């Protein structure tokens, strides 16, 4: 076999292996919990109808203050029953979206669940040892959590994203009609 043919074969195989790795790695996501299972966790079998806050005025201003001015939505979707709200929010960690569910009860976070984790770094935010830090947290002064959230080495952006989403869930809970945290 000539050197040229070997070169072509090696090149084609290398490109195939590289593209296979790249495609599967770029599509990789870790689905931890489905939306339906998250809502069952929040409300058991009696899941309320989804509601929404229109993304304008105070809702828009507050959300963009927490998440950044480029945060745009049409509606902030939530589920509410007996003073408890559930929120499914997304935020980019370092490069890819983190989808998380937040349950707010009595103006405090009662639990956080990572639904889909797409990042290759910072995966520790998926585990209860990190998420449980948020349980019982509420907002003070309109912009801070009343609890200090410990970071994770190498996962600063994922931790910051989870913290911002927690603040957003708490703040939006307060804006839902029939709730009053202030």
List the model feature ranges, each with a label.
Residues 10-20:
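Bacterial N-terminal signal peptides
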Residues 2-12:
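Bacterial N-terminal signal peptides that target proteins for export
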Residues 27-149, 156, 160, 164-182:
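Flexible, solvent-exposed loop/hinge segments and secondary-structure transition points
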């Amino acid at each position: 076999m000539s050197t040229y043919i070997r070169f072509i074969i090696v090149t084609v195989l290398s490109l195939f292996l590289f593209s296979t790795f790249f495609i599967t790695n770029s599509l990789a996501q870790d689905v931890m919990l489905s939306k339906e299972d998250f809502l069952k966790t929040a409300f058991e079998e009696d899941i309320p109808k989804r509601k929404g806050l229109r993304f304008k005025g105070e809702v828009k201003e507050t959300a963009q203050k927490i998440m950044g001015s480029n945060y745009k939505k049409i509606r902030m979707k939530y589920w509410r029953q007996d003073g408890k709200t559930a929120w499914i929010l997304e935020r980019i960690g370092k490069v890819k979206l983190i989808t998380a569910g937040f349950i707010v009860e009595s103006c405090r976070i009662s639990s956080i669940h990572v639904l889909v984790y797409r990042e290759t770094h910072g995966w520790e935010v998926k585990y209860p040892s990190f998420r449980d830090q948020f349980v019982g947290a509420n907002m003070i002064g309109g912009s801070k959590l009343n609890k200090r959230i410990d970071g994770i080495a190498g996962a600063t952006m994922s931790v910051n994203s989870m913290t911002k989403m927690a603040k957003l869930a708490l703040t939006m809970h307060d804006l839902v009609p029939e709730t009053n945290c202030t």
